[in-house]
């Protein structure tokens, strides 16, 4: 089912055009399972009719003395990545990598809406394959355009044990399904792809 989100709000207190800082209250009932502000999550900031999309890269408490029985002011640092636009009410929202109007002081920020998150990750027309689902919203598929992926260099990187070999195997299987004409050569000195 669809994840029910806490729609608590925060407010922009700083913005330089690339990044913004949002001030919010972390309630005393917040726990790890319902944590609303989390690194790696997308949020949205209302600016007129559009919603700026930001990626949370850091969260810090204003007061380092944390008491689980009290509310705390937290600062959420976000990188501005684009905006959600909707030209007409009857049309679905879409994501644009540009930003027409930047957040002002006091602009309202909240967890991104389901439809907006889907718009950010919407598949373009092309040779699309589903490789999983989004960590932020499992009901939204994670997709790639095989032709775009193969038209440029790409790498799968990560630390030991995070699943690089599994990811490469999945990618190769999906690519070959869509493009059976493609030739694949794997140099495997550590015998990770023997099966």
Language-model segments: which ranges?
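Glycine-rich phosphate-binding loop of nucleotide-binding enzymes
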Residues: 128-195
